[in-house]
């Protein structure tokens, strides 16, 4: 018989009128505070808040945690912060930021010195369900939160793709490393261009397009060629229409092809000053419809197959403000999934659509 897992929950996310589907325990999990079936009242909340002084947490079972944290009483940014702390995403982001802010590349930019960080990132792929990790990646956030966050996201997405392709552990680590360092050359570009709060001018875009070459220069002689060339070639296209070298077909390595998909996906689900963040479902449709030409179709289809499977059965907020559940995501029409809402099952359209995908892991 499996042991049910307890999770820490801040008392402030309980609310007056909540009917408990399971027991609530104290912050150590040893003392039953509120039994299953009991209704939370304002008086009980006040007692819980004062029960253990500065410790304002209780312990609940995993199922109760998810139910509470996906409720509309809990603001999305709160759910996000708790999820990122639980996964260790916030810790990874901080560590990567500390490295990227240093310009003494010789002191840290090597496979040996980055190995512990890469193992930690790769370990998240084993320890957490992809949907939990994707909830960290997909949460709408401004691009000026940093190159570091984008690099972490691409590393995680690369690792997921490697796992879904059943690649051996060494290749998973190589792809995670390639994702982490794919844009390292942007540290050589003026910050006012990298973090410009608008679309770049033609002149600025020309400068920005040098970043793959700068990445190559920084990584040359320090890393496996697969890592270096993924950084140089992740903006190349199979049809020869990419940059900086205009290579095509078999000249484009597998590591670069996979990194290109991860890079595009993360860019599209992130907000910029001149565009909003796209829902994952929208990006799935764009990838299937080949709006990003020159990608490896085999890898794109594998990415979509696995992403669609992970988002099926997830909770969503619909345009009418009510909750629903994704029952099916059509491959050729991913931005119009089949939704169940209050017993009604139908496909979304232009007037009834998904506004938010909910996760609380």
Regions from the PLM with identified roles:
Residues 24, 193-194, 200, 238-243, ...:
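Short clusters of hydrophobic/aromatic residues that line enzyme substrate/ligand-binding pockets
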Residues 142, 195-204, 231-232, 255, ...:
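Short alpha-helical linear motifs
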Residues 1-109, 114-115, 277-361:
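Terminal helices and disordered tails flanking the catalytic cores of nucleotide-processing hydrolases
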Residues 154, 177, 181-188, 205-301, ...:
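Alpha-helical scaffolding flanking metal-ion-dependent phosphate/phosphodiester catalytic sites
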Residues 68-206, 220-221:
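Acidic/His-rich, divalent-metal-binding segments that scaffold phosphate/diphosphate chemistry
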């Amino acid at each position: 018989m499996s042991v049910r897992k307890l999770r820490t929950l801040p008392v402030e996310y309980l609310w007056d009128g909540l009917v408990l589907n399971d027991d609530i325990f104290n912050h150590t999990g040893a003392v039953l505070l509120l039994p299953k079936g009991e209704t939370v009242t304002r008086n009980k909340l006040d007692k819980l808040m004062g029960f253990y002084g500065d410790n304002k947490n209780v312990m609940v079972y995993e199922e109760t945690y998810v139910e509470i944290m996906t409720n509309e009483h809990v603001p999305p940014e709160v759910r996000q912060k708790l999820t990122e702390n639980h996964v260790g995403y916030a810790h990874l982001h901080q560590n990567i930021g500390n490295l990227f802010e240093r310009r003494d590349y010789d002191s840290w930019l090597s496979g040996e010195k980055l190995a512990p960080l890469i193992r930690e990132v790769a370990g998240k792929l084993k320890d957490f369900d992809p949907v939990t990790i994707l909830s960290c990646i997909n949460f709408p956030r401004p691009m000026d939160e940093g190159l570091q966050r984008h690099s972490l996201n691409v590393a995680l997405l690369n690792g997921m793709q490697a796992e879904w392709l059943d690649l051996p552990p060494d290749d998973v680590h190589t792809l995670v490393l390639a994702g982490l360092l794919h844009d390292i050359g942007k540290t050589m570009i003026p910050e006012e261009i990298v973090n410009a709060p608008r679309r770049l001018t033609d002149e600025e875009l020309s400068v920005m397009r040098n970043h793959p070459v700068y990445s190559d220069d920084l990584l040359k002689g320090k890393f496996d060629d697969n890592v270096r060339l993924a950084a140089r070639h992740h903006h190349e296209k199979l049809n020869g229409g990419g940059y900086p070298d205009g290579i095509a077909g078999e000249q484009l390595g597998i590591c670069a092809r996979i990194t290109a998909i991860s890079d595009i996906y993360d860019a599209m689900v992130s907000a910029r000053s001149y565009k909003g963040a796209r829902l994952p479902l929208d990006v799935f449709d764009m990838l299937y419809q080949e709006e990003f030409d020159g990608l490896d179709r085999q890898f794109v289809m594998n990415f979509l197959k696995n992403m669609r499977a992970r988002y099926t059965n997830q909770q969503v907020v619909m345009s009418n403000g009510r909750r629903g559940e994704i029952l099916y995501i059509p491959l050729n029409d991913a931005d119009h999934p089949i939704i169940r809402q209050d017993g009604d099952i139908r496909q979304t359209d232009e007037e009834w659509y998904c506004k938010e995908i909910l996760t609380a892991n």
